Curated annotation (Swiss-Prot):
Role played: Catalyzes amidations at positions B, D, E, and G on adenosylcobyrinic A,C-diamide. NH(2) groups are provided by glutamine, and one molecule of ATP is hydrogenolyzed for each amidation.
Pathway: Cofactor biosynthesis; adenosylcobalamin biosynthesis
Phylogenetic placement of the source organism: Bacteria, Bacillati, Bacillota, Clostridia, Eubacteriales
PROSITE patterns, A to Z: GATASE_COBBQ
PANTHER family: COBYRIC ACID SYNTHASE, DETHIOBIOTIN SYNTHETASE
UniProt-annotated catalytic positions: 326, 432
Record flagged with keyword Plastid: no
Family named by the database record: Belongs to the CobB/CobQ family. CobQ subfamily.
One of the record's GO molecular function terms: ABC-type vitamin B12 transporter activity
Lipid metabolism is among the record's keywords: no
Designated name of the protein: Cobyric acid synthase
Length: 493
């Protein structure tokens, strides 16, 4: 089996999409290929068919490889709960909560597990495309590294180093990274990639020659800056700004926002623009307000109260349409109870009182794939998604359920999810990915169109659009990189 590892000079240099592109290229060339990231830190996660939790970046990479996402592609997921603590997910299940130092001490324990996981991939695939995290030059973490050079050493993988020229300083970041690697690590780096380039590459070439003279490693290509409608799992998410879009969707960007990939399908609608708001001054008059998921719902509710957004949301709820997802659904209720102090020591807190319901946080996390249908709609109107939450919500007779769940992890079930007020303009659900399918997305957006005097439209199938975008990404990267050299590095062709 062949393997290649993509590492970067820093976070957000484009490692994830380079891995996705290589997965699609190798697949197009007839190889069975699998993505692998030993440890990911993200608040955007996904639930597999067997009810296990993994990072969203490896989900996109799995689709690029033509695979159903599985947790062996991302054995360890860290979900920050505060500046100093994270929830640790190992092989799709909650391992526990720990501080950075506690987790640093746990890494030795996980090395053997990661090695065994990778052995299974060697048996099943022609090529594994690995992804590092942050930078391999974090010299204070070197002795227990399990995600960059430490992981490359465990499986003896060659490395390509990616630098982001769009931020500036790409030559210094590449040369500086190489300077901080030890001799064994330097030998693993077989090439560099310049990512997110704008302009004429001829102007860049002299710098590439000088860089190669300094670090003695060839540049394998320059990838142009390209806007693609593919999800971004990084915290500083930026949605494509459209020159004009009649449907304005505002999203509350809370400090602990999670699973904002729920919004990706919405931004695929041509007449929809999405903007994040962090203050009441930015609120304005949106056509739809979305309150997304949160890794710390109580802290984010306190944030809404402190910054004045609570008042804006309540005023908007008189005539505007509001959708809350997971944590955003919980804050819409009358009360959140935390008897086991899962999130804070407060015990309980008053909600926004826009839905007559109460949420209680339990000890165990619910992670499940679900299929549902809108209440009072035809059975064909199916919504697919997944749940990731520790809260159980109970509502009064003043609110109605939004969905009926009929399938849970492949088993037939019959229970309700979500809630909608009597007026029908404030609603919430635990289902992540609720907009990915056509049914609910088209229904909501068409209601907004009609309200503004616009014609109804058919929504495109998000999965089809994603496939086209992945092919486009692969074409761009194939044209930009020396693929013959990359095949030579991994010992193929």
């Amino acid at each position: 089996m062949a393997k290649i590892m993509i590492q970067g000079t820093a976070s957000s240099v484009g490692k994830s999409l380079i891995v996705a592109a290589l997965c699609r290229i190798f697949k197009q060339d007839g190889y069975s290929v699998c993505p692998f990231k030993s440890q990911n830190m993200s608040l955007n996660s996904y639930i597999t068919l067997d009810g296990k939790e993994m990072g969203r970046a490896q989900v996109l990479q799995a689709y690029a490889a033509g695979l159903e996402p599985e947790v062996y592609m991302n054995p360890i997921l860290l979900k920050p709960t505060s500046d100093k603590k994270s929830q640790i997910i190992v092989n799709g299940k909650v391992y526990g909560n720990s501080t950075a130092m506690e987790y640093h001490n746990l890494k030795i324990k996980f090395k053997g597990m990661l090695k065994e996981q990778f052995k299974k991939l060697e048996e099943d695939f022609d090529i594994v495309v690995m992804e590092g995290a942050g930078s391999p030059a974090e010299i204070n973490l070197r002795d227990r590294d399990i995600v960059n050079m430490g992981m490359a050493e465990i499986v003896d993988a060659p490395v390509l180093l990616v630098g982001d020229i769009d931020k500036g300083g790409v030559f210094a970041s590449l040369a500086g990274t190489m300077l901080l690697l030890n001799e064994g690590e330097k030998e693993r780096v077989k090439g560099t990639i310049i990512n997110k380039f704008r302009g004429d590459v001829e102007i860049l070439n002299p710098g590439l020659d000088m860089l190669e003279d300094i670090i003695h490693i060839p540049c394998l290509g320059v990838v142009p800056y390209t806007r693609l409608q593919l999800e971004d799992e990084d915290g500083a998410v930026e949605f494509n700004k459209k020159a004009y879009a009649p449907i304005d969707i505002a999203v509350i960007k809370m400090p602990h926002i999670s699973n904002f990939t729920d919004l990706d399908a919405l931004k695929s609608e041509e007449d929809v623009s999405i903007r994040f708001i962090t203050s009441k001054e930015e609120f304005k008059e949106p056509d739809l307000l979305v309150i997304p998921g949160s890794k710390n719902t109580i802290e984010d509710l306190l944030y809404l109260r402190k910054c004045g957004l609570e008042e804006s949301i309540k005023e908007y709820s008189k005539d505007g349409k509001i959708i809350g997802i997971c944590g955003g659904y919980q804050v819409l209720g009358s009360k959140i109870k935390d008897p086991y102090k899962v999130e804070t020591d407060l015990g309980e807190i008053e909600g926004l009182n826009l839905l007559d319901m109460e949420t209680t946080f339990e000890k165990e996390k619910i992670t499940t794939r679900v299929s549902a249908k809108l209440i009072n709609e035809e059975i064909e109107n199916i919504v697919y998604g997944y749940e990731i939450h520790m809260g159980i919500s109970e509502y009064s007779e003043n609110v109605k359920p939004l969905f009926k769940i009929y399938d849970k992890n492949g088993e037939k079930v019959d229970y309700f999810d979500g809630a909608i007020n009597e007026k029908g303009n404030v609603m919430g659900t635990y289902i992540h990915g609720v907009f990915d399918g056509i049914v609910f997305r088209e229904k909501i957006i068409n209601e907004l169109r009609v309200k503004k005097g616009l014609k109804k439209k058919k929504s495109q199938v998000y999965e089809h659009m994603r496939e086209k975008e992945l092919d486009k990404l692969a074409d761009i990267v194939r044209q930009s990189l020396d693929m013959e050299k990359i095949y030579s590095i991994i010992g193929m062709k």
